Amino acid sequence: ATFTFGVKENNYLGKGLGVEANATINEESFKGLFSVNNPNYNNSDKSLYTIFKATETDRLSNFGYKSNLIGLELGTKFQYLKQFNFGLSGRSFYEDIQTDSSASDKQKKQSGSYWDTFTSVSFDLDKRNQKFKTTEVYRSSFTSDLPIITKTNTFTNKYVYNYYSELYENNITNFSLYLKSARSLTNDDIKLSERLYIPGRRLRGFESGKIGPKDGSDFIGGNYITSLNFSTTLPQILENSQNVDFLLFLDAANV
């Protein structure tokens, strides 16, 4: 079983600050996040944000390894040109990986402590007619994480494209493409925490984290992921209901 809980405030203390805290817990892992975002820092029309993150993955009993990661990210985002946003951030993480005699050779090689620092740049072209219930045009974004201080020199890229259309009255149709890669610039094996999994909302109906390459019977994620998603609302079903929405979707993905 997985339990998720969190709180989010968009106008903390009446100062316009965005504050969010959430946690996800299951029998093998804990993921926690706390973030503060100032969307108009010093009246500059630039957002300034801080993210604190902590995770623990405990698979000692089943696969012979355990990982603890804690880190901090500082960044900014702003509109560089009309409908074009630019982001820049730096983040550092400390990770400790422990293994025992039952771990695979791949995991034993990664045992130890790591200090990793990355710089991230993002480009976001947002042509949507509105952020909520978008019915027209598209949004295209690209993010790249550049290794600064790492043992594995993992270089990560992500591209997301969303196209929206209103095929008929009150309908919202969306097509989405999601591409992500993580590979070592020095041809090292990247860490388990850096490997990629299909996000659950991009492959609905499957157990999250249970798709893709295995190390023995352990799902360890991949270096490349792709997903195609299509969805369309069906407003003609219970069209007088304000609380119920019907959605037809098709998801396809590869790890």
Model-identified regions with their sequence ranges:
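Solvent-exposed loop/turn segments connecting transmembrane beta-strands
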Residues: 1-2, 21-32, 58-67, 146-155, ...
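Feature captures outer-membrane beta-barrel proteins of Gram-negative bacteria and organelles
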Residues: 3-11, 30-43, 48-50, 68-80, ...
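A short acidic, often aromatic-flanked loop/helix-cap motif at beta-alpha or helix-coil junctions
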Residues: 28, 57, 95, 204, ...
